């Protein structure tokens, strides 16, 4: 049979009365006794093909033997469908192909799940074990088409802006950057290990010192950390670095690139500039450093009520350097029973809150277990602070500021989902700026970098590294989309003395800093330009653009929540010979 002339999903009225050759998989087969209809599928979609003895008795005879997922090639004429059989839901729904020739290329056993049913409830482990079948589903095929369009758009934009695509090593040195490294033993250097990169951070800075000015890479990164729905042990990063720039330059470039991507991929115009808020403002208003701004329900500080009311929980929190904050679920008073609110209390307990106080606003005041503590003036103040109205449910947490933020921030998202407050069609981009440079780790009894050790402090805060490092702010910025951290960036330290000081604040001895990062400190001696950049999570970006809720749906061959590959059964044991070559012994 001749070469394929087009894809199944591209057969439309533009090809009427033309002969086409198609190759693909049998999606559906319907035998009407003397007539056989088959939906033939490839990556672009499917088209109805018809076997009729008037066209070819031989082709009809062969079609009687085909089953789901057989691989076939057909030749035939494109014709308009009978008006009663038109399918407006698919691009090919106006036409059909009257088959004159068919050849079975390959047969298929009955698949473990039906590929022609999109909304079936198939166990995810089965889908991942037979991922090559799962990827045949049109839903996932479209996801990966959009992933390709996304990377193409990114490359086109960065190429237009003068960026060089430069690869960095995959086998590199283990350095303490936050998560655990994946280690690779060296056969040649006994007892020594490479690490798979958590990011190309240091190498891209070295490329700036090398004079390349603008670098990017769409690169695999590896982190041995606990998994969540939006995390994978290996993930793809859009890594970008620029010389002679400030924070505004990098953010402006990032906005323009994302605006281009959304326009190219979804044909949606994203307004610029993106909204901005400081880290402190995000935590105050949303209880999160990656706020979802598609709905209201902000956290409201009502600590002054705690000072005035004779309610011990509120008063104790305020008197012990804590605070009282509230969120208002508009019109939700009748939707939540006492039992429902008990479940919400258990939910905030997960985030460290000792309890969840609440009142319902009614026409003549308040109802609920703490309503008796509210005098008339307190009710008026509550309504003034929160704009709560009759029918609203008001929920309070009184605790240390970090506990209040985490618990109410999480509760805000939970309520929004339960009350269907989120407009899923929105793409709300946001910059979070003015991050703390450092965080204090109570377990380690030392400071750790809030982003990474190479982030520059704000110029005016450099002196604070000696006196009050906890108050130093970073030249750092995160871009957030719909409540997910899409990417993070910063202006980097480009001065060896300041970098050495940063290592000192982080608890490195001079010898440790030299052993771990001596090559970077040496590079700073030879004229390092000011530089900064950003790294975006490609998998996460595609997840949000396609409306998926699980990162695994945007990765062709993902790992499970326990970091295993059900398809290949990785990780797996290796032979004694392999271990011996690497001078390794497994201790059970």
Curated annotation (Swiss-Prot):
Span of the signal peptide: none
Domain of life: Bacteria
Predominant location: cytoplasm
EC number: 6.1.1.12
Annotated GO biological process: aspartyl-tRNA aminoacylation
Classification via Pfam families: GAD, tRNA-synt_2, tRNA_anti-codon
Residues binding ATP: 223-225, 232, 485, 537-540
One function term, GO molecular function aspect: nucleic acid binding
Catalytic activity: tRNA(Asp) + L-aspartate + ATP = L-aspartyl-tRNA(Asp) + AMP + diphosphate
Claim: Cytoplasm is one of the keywords in the record: yes
Keywords: Aminoacyl-tRNA synthetase, ATP-binding, Cytoplasm, Ligase, Nucleotide-binding, Protein biosynthesis
Family assignment from sequence similarity: Belongs to the class-II aminoacyl-tRNA synthetase family. Type 1 subfamily.
PANTHER family: ASPARTATE--TRNA LIGASE, MITOCHONDRIAL (PTHR22594:SF5), ASPARTYL/LYSYL-TRNA SYNTHETASE (PTHR22594)
General function of this protein: Catalyzes the attachment of L-aspartate to tRNA(Asp) in a two-step reaction: L-aspartate is first activated by ATP to form Asp-AMP and then transferred to the acceptor end of tRNA(Asp).
Subunit structure: Homodimer.
Name this protein carries in UniProt: Aspartate--tRNA ligase
């Amino acid at each position: 049979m001749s070469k394929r002339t087009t894809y199944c999903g591209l057969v439309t009225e533009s090809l009427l009365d033309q002969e086409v050759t198609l190759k693909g998989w049998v999606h559906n087969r319907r035998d009407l006794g003397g007539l056989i209809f088959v939906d033939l599928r490839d990556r672009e979609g499917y088209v109805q093909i018809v076997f009729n003895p008037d066209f070819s008795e031989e082709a009809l005879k062969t079609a009687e033997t085909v089953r789901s997922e057989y691989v076939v090639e057909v030749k035939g004429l494109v014709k308009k469908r009978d008006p009663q059989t038109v399918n407006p839901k698919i691009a090919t729904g106006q036409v059909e192909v009257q088959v004159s020739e068919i050849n079975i290329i390959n047969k298929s056993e009955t698949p473990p799940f039906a590929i022609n049913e999109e909304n079936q409830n198939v166990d995810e482990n089965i889908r991942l074990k037979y991922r090559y079948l799962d990827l045949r589903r049109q839903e996932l095929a479209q996801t990966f088409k959009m992933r390709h369009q996304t990377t193409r758009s990114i490359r086109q934009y960065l190429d237009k802006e003068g960026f060089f695509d430069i690869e960095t090593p995959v086998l590199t040195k283990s350095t303490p950057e936050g998560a655990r490294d994946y280690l690779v033993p060296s056969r040649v250097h006994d007892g020594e290990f490479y690490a798979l990169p958590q990011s190309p951070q240091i190498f891209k800075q070295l490329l700036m010192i090398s004079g390349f000015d603008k670098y990017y890479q769409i690169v695999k990164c590896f982190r041995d950390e606990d998994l969540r729905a939006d995390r994978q042990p290996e993930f793809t990063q859009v890594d970008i670095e620029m010389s002679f720039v400030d924070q505004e330059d990098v953010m402006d470039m990032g906005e323009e690139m994302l605006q281009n991507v959304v326009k190219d991929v979804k044909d949606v115009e994203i307004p610029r500039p993106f909204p901005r808020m400081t880290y402190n403002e995000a935590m105050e208003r949303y209880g999160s450093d990656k706020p979802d701004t598609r709905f209201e329900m902000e956290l409201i500080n009502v600590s002054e009520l705690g000072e005035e009311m004779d309610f011990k929980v509120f008063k104790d929190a305020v008197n012990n350097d804590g605070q009282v904050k509230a969120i208002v679920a508009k019109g939700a008073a009748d939707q939540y029973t006492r039992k429902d609110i008990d479940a919400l209390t258990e939910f905030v307990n997960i985030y460290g809150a000792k309890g969840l106080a609440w009142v319902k606003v009614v026409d003549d005041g308040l109802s609920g277990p703490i309503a008796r503590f509210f005098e008339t003036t307190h009710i008026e103040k509550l309504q003034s602070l929160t704009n709560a109205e009759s029918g609203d449910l008001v929920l309070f947490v009184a605790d240390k500021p970090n506990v209040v933020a985490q618990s109410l921030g999480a509760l805000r998202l939970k309520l929004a989902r339960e009350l269907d407050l989120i407009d899923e069609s929105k793409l709300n981009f946001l910059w979070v700026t003015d991050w703390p440079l450092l965080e204090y780790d109570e377990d380690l009894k030392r400071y750790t970098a809030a982003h990474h050790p190479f982030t520059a402090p704000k110029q005016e805060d450099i002196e604070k590294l000696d006196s009050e490092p906890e108050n130093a702010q970073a030249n750092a910025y995160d871009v957030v989309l719909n409540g997910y951290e899409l990417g993070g960036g910063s202006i980097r330290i480009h001065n060896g003395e300041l970098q050495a000081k940063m290592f000192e604040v982080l608890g490195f001895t001079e010898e440790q800093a030299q052993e771990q990062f001596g090559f970077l400190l040496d590079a700073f001696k030879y004229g390092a330009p000011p530089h900064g950049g950003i790294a975006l999570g490609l998998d996460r970006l595609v997840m949000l653009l396609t409306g998926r809720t699980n990162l695994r749906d945007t990765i062709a061959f993902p790992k499970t929540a326990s970091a295993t590959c059900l398809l290949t059964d990785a990780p797996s044991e290796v032979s004694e010979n392999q271990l011996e070559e690497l001078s390794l012994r497994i201790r059970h």
